[in-house]
Design a protein with these regions (language model features):
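Short amphipathic alpha-helix used as the core "switch/output" element in two-component signaling
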Residues: 61-72
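Two-component/phosphorelay signaling modules centered on CheY-like receiver
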Residues: 11-29, 94-97
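C-terminal output helix
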Residues: 86, 104-116, 121
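Acidic catalytic/metal-coordinating carboxylates
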Residues: 33, 59-62
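Acidic, metal-coordinating helix/loop segments flanking the phosphotransfer/catalytic sites
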Residues: 30-48
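Active-site residues of response regulator receiver
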Residues: 52
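The feature encodes the CheY-like receiver
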Residues: 56
Length: 125
């Protein structure tokens, strides 16, 4: 089973994403910064990584470039609440990277939770 990794420094956003992803029956690993994520070990190719571009310390762009440089990179999705200009500058060297703008909606996240071509289904509480 793939793991959904959430790298987000805002605890409220991180907690909401954890609950949403778990509600769809996925295994979740969450990190408050890029350093903690990178120290946790290399993600698997089937994993999905949601990365906030505005991380403190090791920034989201650095984490994404590291992930894209892996022999078998996982699916990566950038998230940001920054202005359009800031986002475009941050992603200039990262073409074709999916981006979700904050505030996040469940409908924008669920397509990235598909596993092996099967859509995620909401689990009953």
């Amino acid at each position: 089973m793939a793991t959904i990794h959430i790298i987000e420094d805002d605890w409220g956003v991180r907690d909401a994403l954890i609950e949403l992803v778990r509600g769809f029956g996925h295994r979740v690993a969450a990190y408050a910064d890029g350093e903690a994520f990178m120290q946790a070990g290399t993600p698997l190719p089937d994993d999905v990584i949601f990365v906030d571009l505005g991380l403190p310390g090791v920034g989201g762009q650095h984490v994404i470039k590291w992930l894209k440089g892996l022999a078998q990179p996982p699916r990566v999705v950038a998230i940001s609440g920054r202005s359009r200009g800031d986002i475009e500058a941050a992603l200039r060297d990262l073409p074709n990277l999916p981006l979700l703008r904050k505030p996040l909606a469940a409908e924008s996240i669920t397509p990235y939770l598909e596993e092996r071509g099967r859509p995620s289904r909401r689990c009953s509480p």
